[in-house]
Amino acid sequence: MNQEFLIQLGERACKNAENLTLPAELEGIFFCAPSSRESLATQVFVAIAFVLLMATAIIGNSVVMWIIYQHKVMHYGFNYFLFNMAFADLLIALFNVGTSWTYNLYYDWWYGDLCTLTSFFGIAPTTVSVCSMMALSWDRCQAVVNPLQKRPLSRKRSVIAILIIWVVSTVTALPFAIAASVNSLYTYDVVTSTVSKAHVCSAPVNTFFEKVLFGIQYALPIIILGSTFTRIAVAFRATNEATDSSLKNNHTRAKSKAVKMLFLMVVAFVVCWLPYHIYHAFALEEFFDAARGKYAYLLIYWIAMSSCAYNPIIYCFANERFRIGFRYVFRWIPVIDCKKEQYEYSQLFPDKMRSMAISLQKGRVNSSCLDKKVKENSSQDLVCVMHSEKNTKKYSKVHLLSCHER
């Protein structure tokens, strides 16, 4: 496209406000706009905000996946869904946040054919996370409301449900990914009287698909999650009224902790995505000028994308096993004290904990026997010998104290 022709066209259409009919090849891709160059401080601030978000999400979700995968005690249905959500959030941080923040700041697509991939991973992983939360809430609801019945999400059923979720999410995202393409735009800067060329990654607006996506990713989950948590709350209230708090068993307390953790996850998701959906539902971009609108959308977009970073933090504070795993991974930080022995004899290794408990119990028994023997044979000399027995699984020495008369 001839640069001089575009500048002349911009002067007539933008500065002189003449009612011009644009050439067919420029229809919809030529715009008048003030200078969109950002100050260095603004660019650095936005870059730091999004890089920190990406780093937190990538590291946090990677650690969650490692904890679940590496430790056998974590291999059950509920945690399979947590692993699935962590993987989905990792994809969002890598393929969506990693490319979209520069596009939203500079209004220029730098990544070529990754447009299709970014469009897909902007929708599919979010749908996976939402559907996983709905499945978990239903599972928790059944466990609380019908505690004597068999758990609906066994290991096998959990894997099947996760596969179905990915199929549904892929089908949901495909229309947007297929329609996405990279197009050129020409912008006339009314301040500098220059024309710049930029590339946009976008898909034609389809109201039907937009409404379907809103229903799947936000409206339907709120209805389902709201109903399941209401039933859970009613069931817990009935249980509390019928049972003295001192008589609650560990199983009931574990259920309560899992429900609270899931509730925090749902609240974080709803709060983070609410401004984003309000912005698009009510077309709030029309209420801002070009400069303020960009910053408003960047803030709203950052809040929405930050939902992929909060779940690992919630797990760490709400679950002892995740907390131990995180402490062990970050033990190199001076303020975190987690020795290898503390990690290996923690709730992540229940077999070792039982072995240690048995050893300590034997030690206490032999110690009491020794005290009794000393009292009975105070006039005799005793020889105390340290014997060692080998654990048949790990061959770790367990020392037992025994005594005999000399």
UniProtKB/Swiss-Prot annotation:
It comes from the Eukaryota. One of its GO terms (cellular component) is plasma membrane. It holds the Pfam family 7tm_1. It is a multi-pass membrane protein. Residues 1-47, 98-115, 180-204, 283-297 are extracellular. It is found in: Cell membrane. The chain crosses the membrane at residues 48-68, 77-97, 116-136, 159-179, 205-225, 262-282, 298-318. Its main location: membrane. The keyword Flavoprotein does not apply. SUPFAM superfamilies: Family A G protein-coupled receptor-like (SSF81321). GO terms for molecular function: tachykinin receptor activity. Residues 69-76, 137-158, 226-261, 319-406 are cytoplasmic. Keywords: Cell membrane, G-protein coupled receptor, Membrane, Receptor, Transducer, Transmembrane, Transmembrane helix. Belongs to the G-protein coupled receptor 1 family. Not known. Putative receptor. This is Probable G-protein coupled receptor tkr-1. It comes from Caenorhabditis elegans. The gene is tkr-1.
